UniProtKB/Swiss-Prot annotation:
EC number from the UniProt entry: 4.2.1.11
Keywords carried by this UniProt record: Cytoplasm, Glycolysis, Lyase, Magnesium, Metal-binding, Secreted
Species for this entry: Leptothrix cholodnii (strain ATCC 51168 / LMG 8142 / SP-6)
Required cofactor names: Mg(2+)
PROSITE patterns in the record: ENOLASE (PS00164)
Catalytic function, reaction form: (2R)-2-phosphoglycerate = phosphoenolpyruvate + H2O
Function as written in the Swiss-Prot or TrEMBL entry: Catalyzes the reversible conversion of 2-phosphoglycerate (2-PG) into phosphoenolpyruvate (PEP). It is essential for the degradation of carbohydrates via glycolysis.
Cofactor note: Binds a second Mg(2+) ion via substrate during catalysis.
Record localization: Cytoplasm; Secreted; Cell surface
Record protein name field: Enolase
Encoding gene (name): eno
Length: 427
């Protein structure tokens, strides 16, 4: 038995300079696991609650001392002596202890930090890398990265309403090559922007945040960069969008303020469909607002056979909401964010439910990240096939890419890079 003998929570800082929760878990054998949780900017209204102090005299009210206190008192008392190898029992203990539907009492940030740190300690105790501990011998598939090269919306201060424009190296022969292709396109895009006199400042997730006249102009810049780097758009590198449409949905319409447009769900669907016809876009995330289920149905019926339609704010990594979406034929993919739900067991349950329904599961970072690379291991452990973890800059993003490079090396000849096959929800 790998008994938990000590737990220490602390307040650390994320990539935006805001406080977040880190936790150390010590086992009887002397082995320690450490984990830090991320934090989002554009958040779904039904996400598990991230506990913040609200004390304006500290960190503008964003301190997490109450969450840390919960770890060091109540949570510690409940889990000391438990077997770290019993992840599902530990997570259920945390859920029952919290007693709310949204983890609002103890805080999803406190609970997730403990859940992750316990898993890390148990993996260390077993002598296995984290991906192997979670996934067993079948964990051999690297994820296709969706690299956010142009940021807008809540992730940047520019004229773009859509939050992310991504490159997806579907034609690469390996993860290592996929990363190289992405880096080369990133640097080609930087040169193009520089030569046009456009800012090369980066947003929260490491992508560029240019002010350009339209979303199509931004897409065309990416296509130029793919060509300049020596790759073929569509065949080798596809495109993905994260609209984060809840952020610009108001009074029943979608307001693209940067372009002076106010659109119904039908008109907005028509606009996205026109982009899909014109450009090699194979994935659209949060194309509709989280509450506009009629709009989601419209979008899924129109584009869902040829385009991955990903629910993020829509599903918030929650199996109850995902089940409803599957029954109603809404979307064909779920974005997986561990801090939206607050424990690893519930995260794995959402991935499993998606796969059983023929939906893909895209493992994702948050805009406020840390050096913690757990999501890289989760992507391989679950054979998810896809990961979103930012652009080719900022060490909080590179930590995940670098961990995946290590995992691919560790797997050696058995490593699989699925490429376009990762999009098994498309016909």
């Amino acid at each position: 038995m790998s008994a938990i003998v000590d737990i220490v929570g602390r307040e650390v800082l994320d990539s935006r300079g805001n406080p977040t929760v880190e936790c150390d878990v010590l086992l009887e054998s002397g082995v320690m696991g450490r984990a830090a949780v991320p934090s989002g900017a554009s958040t779904g209204s039904r996400e598990a609650i991230e506990l913040r102090d609200g004390d304006k005299s500290r960190y503008l009210g964003k301190g997490v001392l109450n969450a840390v206190k919960n770890i060091n008192t109540e949570i510690s008392e409940a889990v000391l002596g438990l077997d770290a190898a019993e992840q599902s029992f530990l997570d259920k203990t945390l859920i029952d202890l919290d007693g709310t539907d949204n983890k609002g009492r103890l805080g999803a940030n406190a609970m997730l930090a403990v859940s992750m740190a316990v898993a890390r300690a148990a993996a260390e105790e077993s002598g296995l890398p984290l991906y192997r501990y979670f996934g067993g011998m079948g964990a051999v598939q690297l994820p296709v990265p969706m690299m956010n090269v142009i940021n807008g919306g809540a992730h940047a201060n520019n004229s773009l309403d859509l939050q992310e424009m991504m490159i997806i190296p579907v034609g690469a022969p390996s993860f290592r090559e996929a990363v190289r292709w992405g880096a080369e396109v990133f640097h080609a895009l930087k040169k193009i922007l520089h030569d046009k006199g456009i800012s090369t400042a980066v947003g929260d997730e490491g992508g560029f945040a240019p002010s350009v006249e339209s979303h199509e102009a931004a897409i065309q810049l990416i296509l130029q960069a793919i060509d300049k780097a020596g790759y073929r758009a569509g065949e080798q590198i596809a495109l993905g969008l994260d609209c984060a449409a809840s952020e610009f949905y108001k009074d029943g319409k979608y307001h693209l303020e940067g372009e002076g447009l106010s659109l119904t769900a039908q008109e907005w669907t028509d606009m996205m469909a026109a982009w899909v016809d014109k450009y090699p876009i194979i994935s659209i995330e949060d194309g509709m607002a989280e509450g506009d289920w009629d709009g989601w149905k419209l979008l899924t019926d129109r584009l869902g056979k040829n385009v991955q339609i990903v629910g993020d704010d829509l599903f918030v990594t929650n199996t109850k909401i995902l089940k409803e979406g599957i029954e109603k034929g809404i979307a064909n993919s779920i974005l997986i964010k561990i801090n939206q739900i607050g424990t690893l067991s519930e995260t794995f349950a959402a991935i499993e439910m998606a796969k059983r329904a023929g939906y893909t599961a895209v493992i994702s970072h948050r805009s406020g990240e840390t050096e913690d690379s757990t999501i890289a291991d989760i992507a391989v452990a679950t054979n998810a096939g896809q990961i979103k973890t930012g652009s080719m800059s900022r060490s909080d993003r590179m930590a995940k890419y670098n961990q995946l490079l290590r995992i691919e090396e560790d797997l050696g000849d058995v490593a699989v890079y699925p490429g376009r096959a990762a999009f098994y929800n498309l016909r």
